[in-house]
Amino acid sequence: MKIHVAVTDTALVPAQPSDWLRDAGLSGAMVQFSGQVRDEQGRVEALHLEHYPGMTESVLSTIVEQAGKQWHLNGAWVVHRVGTMSPGDDIVQVAVSAAHRQAAFEACAFIMDLLKTRAPFWKKEFIGGHWFWV
């Protein structure tokens, strides 16, 4: 299985995961999830994310490897953004390729769910001119 895991402070490119996962017909399915910075209350002016370099990538790689074994993936792409972002900015990309669509859907959801609960990211929101840790 080919794997790409990264944490970056630059803007995410929407087509990059699917371009990277293309495998000349080996996979019958590719599923891509893009998460955006959201502001449900109409108050968040910015979001700032920090992480522990090295540890974060290791946790993400472990999650991807676990998904790859469970669903026999051909490829997986996980990129998470850190730094300061605005509502609507892409913050995370998770994409997988597999022989069949059900495996791709399930693995993509699994990776995203574990990423939200296990990856060591710390965030604060800028509201009304002040930063607040979330």
Residue ranges and their predicted role:
Residues 1-90, 98-109, 113-134:
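N-terminal, polar/charged subdomain of small-to-medium soluble alpha/beta proteins
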Residues 94:
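Phosphate/diphosphate ligand-binding glycine-rich loop within oxidoreductases
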